[in-house]
UniProtKB/Swiss-Prot annotation:
It catalyses: shikimate + ATP = 3-phosphoshikimate + ADP + H(+). ATP binds at G17, A18, G19, K20, T21, T22, R123. It comes from Burkholderia thailandensis (strain ATCC 700388 / DSM 13276 / CCUG 48851 / CIP 106301 / E264). Catalyzes the specific phosphorylation of the 3-hydroxyl group of shikimic acid using ATP as a cosubstrate. Mg(2+) binds at T21. Pathway: Metabolic intermediate biosynthesis; chorismate biosynthesis; chorismate from D-erythrose 4-phosphate and phosphoenolpyruvate: step 5/7. This is Shikimate kinase. Keywords: Amino-acid biosynthesis, Aromatic amino acid biosynthesis, ATP-binding, Cytoplasm, Kinase, Magnesium, Metal-binding, Nucleotide-binding, Transferase. Belongs to the shikimate kinase family. Binds 1 Mg(2+) ion per subunit. PANTHER family: SHIKIMATE KINASE, SHIKIMATE KINASE 1, CHLOROPLASTIC. Coiled coil: none annotated.
Length: 184
């Protein structure tokens, strides 16, 4: 990725529930760029929901599909991409994401993530007796990997989606990806 390349991909990473899809879709709208969610693309291609893929192929099989999808999507230019929470587990994915786009890590604390995901049955890694403890463990394990991959870290805290979008756009402006702040 070259600095000041207006066609660079904008890629969101972070744990499940961090807001990658919601914020990514809003950023894409504001930048008038196509939006892709790697998990949704996998579901569309396979015709199966993520939990079914996990059940039939295991996490390893799903991660293979995810790596293929990331490689394919990041060959495009000028897109906004939301990745799955575990996309950064493989070193080759982290390298590819970092090289083929400007990576924004939406960082949320485990408690906020739990509040956002506790009723979502489409998250196979949280189908445990203690999903909050699982999120805490995932956060501890993955936070360094997200940081390794990211160009920017945005603390999600409690701002509105529009507030987060504005923070992302400000970072993109400073990186030369957008010419000026875009108003909602």
């Amino acid at each position: 990725m070259q600095a000041r390349d207006p066609h660079v991909n904008v890629i969101f990473v972070g744990l499940m529930g961090a807001g990658k899809t919601t914020v990514g879709r809003a950023v894409a709208r504001r930048l008038d760029r196509p939006f892709f969610d790697s998990d949704h693309e996998i579901e569309a291609r396979t015709g199966a929901r993520i939990p079914v893929i996990f059940e039939l192929e295991g996490e390893s099989g799903f991660r293979d599909r995810e790596a293929q999808m990331i490689a394919e999507l990041t060959q495009r230019e000028n897109i906004v991409l939301a990745t799955g929470g575990g996309a950064i587990l493989r070193p080759e994915n982290r390298k590819l994401l970092h090289e083929r786009g400007l990576v924004v890590y939406l960082r949320a604390n485990p408690h906020d993530l739990w509040l956002r995901t506790r009723k979502d049955k489409n998250r196979p890694l949280l189908q445990t007796d203690d999903p909050k403890a699982k999120l805490e463990a995932l956060y501890e394990a993955r936070d360094p990997l997200y940081r390794e991959c990211a160009h920017f870290v945005i603390e999600t805290g409690r701002p509105s989606v529009n507030g987060l979008v504005n923070m992302v756009l400000m970072q993109l402006e400073m990186a030369g990806i957008v010419a000026k702040p875009l108003q909602a």
